[in-house]
Amino acid sequence: LCSAASAADLSSTGRGSAVPSGEASWYQALRTGLSQFRNGGGYETSREAMQALAEKACRWDPRTRRPVFLLRNAAPSFCSSACYLLLLKSLQIWDSAQPRPVISERAWLALIPRFGQHDGEGPWGWANANGPGLAVLVHRLGAGINFEDWRKARPGDFMKIFWTDRIGRRESGHLTVLVKDGG
């Protein structure tokens, strides 16, 4: 996955560790994670929003050696921070439902976002960067699909919508998770 956590830490299969018990268990974890988010909180792409994600919403519990995600503290937020936090919370729910934890401490530590982490740097930096970053991360984790084609989408898929054809700094769009068919 990155220098701090290899794909082997998260996966023993080509598809990724988020689906060895079956695809249905992953999508159930994602739906459960989504139900724990609240409405509101504000949409803002700012230093404050980055700080809320990295320092208030995502914490490491040294006693349990597992992450703690405080979803209500991630406010304000923005599209990639909300999608990434949903991904992390869903991974946590999925992992806790397994007979024994599958996601290693090392992998969790790599997945937790850090304030000041640059786009393209580590899993959070991949997810936050414009371009295919979140798609690559979701694919490597086996955590669903990330794409643009509405006709192929199903609830729980990560999607890029309103994406421009520009490259680099001028590239823009919106990340979301399809919640249900039909809008």
Regions found by a protein language model. Give the residues of each.
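Boundary at the C-terminal end of the N-terminal hydrophobic targeting segment
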Residues: 4-7
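N-terminal capping segments
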Residues: 10-129
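...with weaker cross-activation on analogous glycine-rich loops/strands in unrelated enzymes
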Residues: 105-183
